Amino acid sequence: MARHRKFFDPNNENPFEISRSKVENFVRCPACFWLDKVKGIKFPSMPPFNINSNTDKLLKRDFDAVRGIKTHPILEKNGLGHLIPFKHDDLDKWTSSLHFGAKGYFHSVHEETNILLGGGLDDVLINEHTGELHIVDFKSTSNQSKEPKPVNLYGDWKMSYKRQMDMYIWIMRRLGFEVNRVGYF
């Protein structure tokens, strides 16, 4: 089956691929999204923050050291010792956002719209008491204050984090996994 991506073609019967970031583009500016996906006029973008991808890589490497064996010390320290980094043969594919539409990667088709939604997971934890999975999304922040406030998910711009988590939980459930509605950032 040929992949249907980049530009929407109403005559193409294959599911149209939309990444998590493209969903956010639609939420921010539906007209810009339409121009991008139908007319090929690119949505304005920001340069990537290399610190974010480096943080993700370092945290994943740290979790890989105990994956499928035991909890990570930072989880234990924060009262989450019952959560263990999840080991699965497809995890490397699921964490590859650049190939999400390819066979076996992290996506699911929404049948009513024939849209293939996907992205790249940061990580997954398994609850050793319930067997449920918890989606993890690593976020980098800079708080230079002398008295930093705890990071939270309040604020309009953080709604995209919630949508991302909801989408990834939905996809994992569609892949047949028992997934807890609680995810971790």
Q: Residue ranges of each PLM-predicted region?
A:
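Mg2+/Mn2+-dependent nuclease catalytic core
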Residues: H99-F185
